[in-house]
Amino acid sequence: SEMCIRDRCEILLCDKSIEHGEIGVAFTPDEEIGHGAALLDIEGFGCKYAYTVDGGALGELEYENFNAAQAEIRIKGVSIHPGDAKGKMKNALLIANELVSKFPVEQTPAKTEGYEGFFHFDELNATVESAKLVCIIRDHDAEKFSAKKQFVQKACREINDAYGDGTAELVLKDSYRNMREKILPHMHLIENAKKSMENAGVKPVVVPIRGGTDGAQLSFRGLPCPNLCTGGHNFHGLKAVSYTHLTLPT
């Protein structure tokens, strides 16, 4: 999508017959390392509104994303010779397994869709002596998101009640918020994008993002920024994009 944007910029710069207002273009490479568009100088960028080009299938148009948080949980065990362990050993690996088993199986990425949120354990390193788990928390709804964070806190308290204070240490951090509230006052951005897609022969499909986008961070920093499709598929896996989607007339 970056090369397509660059090519379009070249056309606009070289073909003076195409009338247009002021256009700003920025490439933000830091999303996948967790910084998003934090380093983008919005004042220097000089635009009132923007779009990210970070979506999926052709026609997708998005202005809602997950509220997101990350829970890092460290389990402290007690290692001792297994032949002399009765009443003494605390196996951090088994305690970590017990903690994970408290979470609802139906609220995982593989079993949710649309506006359904989830818990996703994406890291576990464990020995008898210690364990580290990382769980990401996602939900579009602010109240459900808050309830999910409280669930994680409760699960860790239950572990400490069972195995002693300090067994489970939780660090819970918010990552980003749903930009919906920042886009609703500027719905002309959505209507204009719909019309542009229709003019190009593309059927617009407004869907919630089951993830995040730099546009969420930018919207909360004062630059309302919905998300446009790239025509790509299977992100974070074996990516694919249709050649015909790259060559649509604009």
Which residues does each predicted region cover?
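Metal-dependent amide/peptide-bond hydrolase catalytic core
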Residues: 92-242, 246
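Alpha-helical metal-binding/catalytic segments enriched in His/Glu/Asp
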Residues: 1-29, 71-75, 81, 86-105, ...
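Structural motif
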Residues: 23-24, 47-51, 71-72, 204-205, ...
